[in-house]
Amino acid sequence: MLAYRVLLVSSLVLAFCNATEPPKQVDMQWGAKIPLRDGVHLNATLYRPHEQKDPLPVIFTFTPYIGDSYLDRATYFSRNGYVYALVDVRGRGNSEGKFEPFANEGRDGYDVVEWLAKQTWCNGKVAMWGGSYAGFDQWTTLKEFPPHLATIVPAAAAHPAVDFPFFHNVYSSYIIQWLTYTSGVTGNTNTFGDSGYWKSKFTDLYMKHLPFQELDRVVGNTTTVFRKWLDHPVADAYWNAMAPTNADYKKISIPILTITGHYDGDQAGAMTYYLRHMQYGTESAKAQHYLIVGPWDHAGTRTPRREVAGLTFADTSLVDLNYLHKQWYDWTMKGGPKPDFLRDRVAYYVAGEDVWRYAASLEALSPKVQKLYLSSTGGRADDVFRSGQLSEAAPSQTEPDHFTYDPLDIRPAALQQKNNPNGLTDQTDVLNLFGNGLIYHTDRFESATEVTGYIKFVAWMAMDVPDTDFAVRLDEVKADGTSVHLTSDMMRARYRDSLTQEKLVKPGEVNRYEFNGFTFFSRKVSKGSRLRLFLSCPNSIQLEKNYNSGKMVAMESGKDARTAHITLYHDPSRASFLEIPVIQ
């Protein structure tokens, strides 16, 4: 027997504030069981407008984070004329089966859509809501093409093998924290949120120079999933089965709203889905796909905040995303007007000017690509106060620049122990290079200049080891010396020519390294500011450490360590340069 009860959604405070308009109620159905094709039953909690009389569209969130955590969203949409279903994925919460991240949500999502569509309280139209993993769920469900899926609105959608569990084939220590969060059937929220514990364990692995594959043992949660992921260090068939193929993108026909942020940790994933649909989709389908890029971090793609990691944005950044979702669902499933905010198919926020701008497509932005060449005086670019230069002047025959990465150097760990609430403005790393890095600055901007889109960095480099990792970052350095992080990229040297085929480096050979995986950003760079390019080899407790031996990186330890001596060239025949998209 299913239990029913009525939830009084609005608080007494709201009731007193607006006594002329009684708070709407919703009806909740606890413990609905959704059958899947293999006999497993998923758990759902259903929220419906009180005393619903007519069938309505259904919105559902498919989550490994326990459906109850989305109560506020469910009641919001139920108060506004929708049935809302919070569905625990297979093996999580009160759902049956075993949870294997990213593996089953596509087929299971299809079955959920079709079951919801057949219920008497549904009018046959089903939509999805959610971000991060629940954004991934939307894309993997869509690739199965359930007939009654009317629209998806993926926010900060993770993309397997693009931004999680690795980025450009470099694993993050965070993955074991996330796997612990989603271990078993409960929420594990307090364990997940104990940052002190996780930093201590990541530091333990780092200080002892243990192989990355031992991380699950070090934290006390040995999982087969962690080891399985490490066995697939590139985007192979295992990962590719989880996301839409090029052929799938050609078949998409429903409206889509993609939401991400300048500082969304899953921006690479969200934009990969979007860009591949723009590349392979039909013209009619692309015309129904809208994109919003706000000045937000990961959580801000669902609940925007003015302050993000040391940056403060204007009130214009605070889009009411609940209301925007409602308008989108009204438009796509009820024949309502197009959402007010969506003035064109691409909406992006220009930080530094605090305005929203619109375009028909990313290509329609038509930026002027400004090429800035790297140079230095006397081969010295290894200090923030004695940096190299970025300029439009063609390179001359100058001495190359050099830096060194010793994977046994543990000094950076001491700088990474505290939580940093100002991560986007912090300059600790550029002030503490420890010989590991090169820095290049432009001249001061003579006028405020909008830079919007993707940058590209090309470096000609040689080294004396068969492999290492590179990290590149671009910042705005203001006239007062403070800085703002703009975008970043990472590369494992063995994958310099292909993310799926490794090719170890021949020591001493000069190779071209093209960094083209930077995140999208938009900023009005202030008059008097400079741009700073920072190149280094990552040496962080938060990342899989490359010990430079050329072996499988997850298996390397301090015993395999080799110091990398890296040379960057910027002469006429080997011009290293940065390309930035300037809006005229």
Which stretches of residues belong to each language-model region?
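N-terminal cap/lid segment of alpha/beta-hydrolase-fold proteins
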Residues: E21-D54, H441-S447
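Cap/lid segment of the alpha/beta-hydrolase catalytic domain
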Residues: P49-K118, P165, R302-F313, F434, ...
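Accessory cap/linker subdomain of secreted extracellular hydrolases
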Residues: R79, K143-K251
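Catalytic cores of eukaryotic secretory-pathway lumenal/extracellular enzymes that build
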Residues: L86, S95, Q138, P146-P154, ...
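Alpha/beta-hydrolase fold nucleophile elbow
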Residues: T120-Y133
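C-terminal, loop-rich substrate-recognition/catalytic regions characterized by aromatic stacking residues
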Residues: Y206-Q213, E307-Q584
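Short beta-strand/loop motif that positions the catalytic acidic residue
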Residues: I252, T258-T260
